[in-house]
Regions:
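M16/MPP (pitrilysin/insulinase) zinc-metallopeptidase core fold and M16-derived inactive scaffolds
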Residues: 43, 81-146, 189-193, 210-214
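Mature N-terminal segment immediately following signal peptide/propeptide cleavage
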Residues: 52-80
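Conserved small/polar residues in nucleotide/adenosyl-binding loops
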Residues: 268-275
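M16/insulysin-pitrilysin zinc metalloprotease superfamily fold
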Residues: 110-114, 146-177, 255
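Scaffold signal of the M16-like zinc-metallopeptidase fold and its non-catalytic homologs
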Residues: 36-42, 112, 155, 162-163, ...
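Acidic/histidine-enriched alpha-helical segments
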Residues: 167-185, 250, 270
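Bacterial N-terminal signal peptides that target proteins for export
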Residues: 3-15
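C-terminal motif of bacterial Sec signal peptides marking the signal peptidase cleavage site
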Residues: 26-27
């Protein structure tokens, strides 16, 4: 579901890859001996080293639910933005359900318990000068949006609810299956994608890279909704997520309410290294 991106969203998507580095370094530098000590060290805020010419202020920490959070304060920003990566992608598709991770990316945007309107999120973002999108990669799925700063509070809350209490209404399964299939048909005609498919054919068939990943009406046939919910509960756990937020407010104001929101993301698994 990836289209042209706003520059702010491009920046945030890039910053999410830096979060991987923060998590890796914090783990490597820890010298604590017990699991409790290591968990305490990982949750302690990490000082972000930045250029002396960078006027922004940064805050990075791991929340109690395992989610890694980077908050950026930029008083000069003309837009506010946020992005969240789940470290689960097409490599995690069940062999019998190629394209399930991509299908979940589509279904996640269809309303939440707090904001149940199926298209309410996109309508709110677009009405207030913003944009939103997502993509599914082999090892992660990324969601992002930007919006006019004065509407960022509600925009971020609407965005965050997708990872807290999404509805994933089964009434929209067929609609989103067809949307996924349309992407497949569009890609199928592209020479670049065909070359990519040939590359997959040459791979070890036991490696997930060799598998079909977009999804189609055929691969998403049958009781796909049950498989969808199982995939969500097994993989969309807070300890498999990293989020980055950029807004005009100072960190003293921004950090507490951003932490409060993302602390509600559920921890389905015990904190563990990302598979």
């Amino acid at each position: 579901m990836l289209q042209a991106r706003d520059k702010t969203s491009e920046l945030l998507s890039s910053l999410l890859f830096l979060i991987l580095g923060f998590g890796f370094l914090s783990g490597c530098q820890s010298t604590d001996n017990t699991p409790e000590d290591r968990q305490t060290a990982e949750m302690a805020p990490i000082e972000v080293i930045k250029s002396p010419n960078d006027p922004r202020a940064y805050h990075f920490e791991t929340l109690p639910n395992g989610l890694k959070l980077l908050v950026i304060s930029d008083a000069a920003a003309d837009k506010s933005a946020a992005a969240l990566t789940v470290f689960r992608g097409s490599f995690h598709d069940p062999k019998e359900r190629p394209g399930l991770a991509h299908f979940l990316e589509h279904m996640l945007f269809i309303g939440t318990e707090k904001y149940p309107e199926p298209d309410g999120y996109f309508s709110f973002i677009e009405t207030h000068g913003g944009s939103s999108n997502a993509y599914t990669a082999p090892d992660h799925t990324n969601y992002f949006f930007d919006i006019q700063p004065e509407f960022f509070g509600e925009g971020l809350d609407r965005f965050g609810q997708f990872f807290i209490a999404p509805l994933m209404d089964p009434a929209y399964v067929e609609r989103e299956k067809n949307a996924v299939h349309s992407e497949y048909q569009m890609q199928y005609k592209a020479d670049g994608w065909r070359g990519f498919t040939v590359q997959k054919q040459a791979m070890n068939p036991d490696h997930p890279f060799s598998q079909f990943s977009i999804g189609s009406l055929e691969t998403l046939d049958g009781d796909v909704y049950s498989d969808l919910m199982t995939f969500f509960e097994e993989h969309y756990s807070a300890d498999q997520m990293s989020a980055v937020v950029l807004h005009k407010e100072p960190l003293e104001t921004l950090v507490p309410w951003v932490k409060a929101l993302f602390s509600d993301c559920l921890l389905y698994t015990s904190p563990s290294p990302r598979d």
